[in-house]
């Protein structure tokens, strides 16, 4: 079994005075978790494998602030950083990579213009491009867009529909088919968030995570729903995720990265020191 990664996710809101890490349920009811650079330093010191920064403001004005946050973080931490949120152009990707990001995650732009994935991976390399899939279960399995049926946590059959704009707009695209397309277009990794689970702390959506992992050969990062370190174990053992993303359980001090890794190691999951 390959070494599994633990990745704290920092959802950042940006203002004229800098950035603030926040966390909510399904991207609403946001609660402040602190300064992004300070949190990043803490996770670096605790042994996180990577960091993900998501600019949830995603405004033109905020982009310069995000670049400043990434530049300051890059001078303090020495683990790979992935940055996303509202990225629409090759120029934005270039600026963020120059600021110190190692990878870029794209979501809505990729759905609206799939060839953007190919263009970005051709220019920067597929290892730099992480495509995020936000999806939500849809129990209307007779929908003509329903290409793959997956069982939900409650046992009911459903297909998973890609959603964009932070989960506000359904697309009619089957998430498993979209994952295959993403891989074909050159994305190096998938970051999968089930909106059914996001922010609930009831655990990752294991069924769709496992189904997408089985449909593609590129790594899949499980995201959305971590409430305990046992949920991370489930993501690795049951869903066979390559990495587990978590936010609030780390931000608010419920667990440290070290505690998560010790627990996983004791249960036979290979993790880095």
Curated annotation (Swiss-Prot):
GO terms, molecular function: imidazoleglycerol-phosphate synthase activity; lyase activity
GO CC, any one term: cytoplasm
Enzyme class at the top of the EC tree: lyase
List of catalytic residues: 11, 134
Catalysed reactions listed for this entry: 5-[(5-phospho-1-deoxy-D-ribulos-1-ylimino)methylamino]-1-(5-phospho-beta-D-ribosyl)imidazole-4-carboxamide + L-glutamine = D-erythro-1-(imidazol-4-yl)glycerol 3-phosphate + 5-amino-1-(5-phospho-beta-D-ribosyl)imidazole-4-carboxamide + L-glutamate + H(+)
Residues forming coiled coils: none
Subcellular location: Cytoplasm
Pathway(s) annotated for this protein in UniProt: Amino-acid biosynthesis; L-histidine biosynthesis; L-histidine from 5-phospho-alpha-D-ribose 1-diphosphate: step 5/9
Matches recorded under InterPro entries: Aldolase_TIM (IPR013785), His_biosynth (IPR006062), HisF (IPR004651), IGPS_HisA/HisF (IPR050064), RibuloseP-bd_barrel (IPR011060)
GO biological process, one term: L-histidine biosynthetic process
Keywords assigned by UniProt, alphabetized: Amino-acid biosynthesis, Cytoplasm, Histidine biosynthesis, Lyase
Keyword check for Lyase: yes
Oligomer and partners: Heterodimer of HisH and HisF.
Function per UniProt: IGPS catalyzes the conversion of PRFAR and glutamine to IGP, AICAR and glutamate. The HisF subunit catalyzes the cyclization activity that produces IGP and AICAR from PRFAR using the ammonia provided by the HisH subunit.
PANTHER family for this protein: IMIDAZOLE GLYCEROL PHOSPHATE SYNTHASE HISHF, IMIDAZOLE GLYCEROL PHOSPHATE SYNTHASE SUBUNIT HISF/H IGP SYNTHASE SUBUNIT HISF/H
UniProt family annotation: Belongs to the HisA/HisF family.
Protein name per UniProt: Imidazole glycerol phosphate synthase subunit HisF
Protein source organism: Methanocella arvoryzae (strain DSM 22066 / NBRC 105507 / MRE50)
């Amino acid at each position: 079994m390959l070494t599994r990664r633990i990745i704290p996710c920092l959802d950042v809101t940006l203002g004229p005075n800098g950035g603030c890490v926040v966390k909510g349920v399904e991207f609403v009811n946001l609660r402040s978790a602190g300064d992004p650079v300070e949190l990043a330093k803490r996770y670096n010191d605790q042994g996180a494998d990577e960091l993900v920064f998501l600019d949830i403001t995603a405004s033109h004005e905020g982009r310069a602030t995000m670049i400043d946050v990434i530049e300051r973080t890059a001078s303090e931490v020495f683990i790979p950083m992935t940055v996303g949120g509202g990225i629409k152009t090759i120029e934005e990707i270039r600026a963020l990579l120059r600021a110190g990001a190692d990878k870029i995650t794209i979501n809505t732009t990729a759905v609206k213009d799939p060839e953007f994935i190919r263009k970005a991976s051709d220019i920067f390399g597929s290892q730099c491009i992480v495509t995020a899939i936000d999806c939500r279960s849809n129990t209307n399995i007779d929908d003509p867009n329903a290409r793959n049926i997956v069982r939900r946590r409650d046992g009911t059959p459903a297909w998973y529909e890609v959603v964009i704009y932070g989960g506000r707009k359904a697309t009619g695209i089957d998430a498993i088919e979209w994952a295959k397309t993403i891989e074909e277009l050159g994305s190096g990794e998938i970051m999968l968030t089930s909106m059914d689970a996001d922010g609930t702390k009831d655990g990752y959506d294991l069924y769709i995570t496992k189904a997408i992992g089985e449909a593609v050969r590129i790594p899949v990062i499980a995201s959305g729903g971590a409430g305990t370190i046992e949920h991370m174990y489930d993501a690795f053992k049951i869903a066979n995720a390559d990495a587990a993303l978590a936010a609030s359980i780390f931000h608010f001090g419920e667990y440290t990265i070290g505690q998560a890794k010790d627990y996983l190691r004791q249960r036979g999951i290979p993790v880095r020191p």
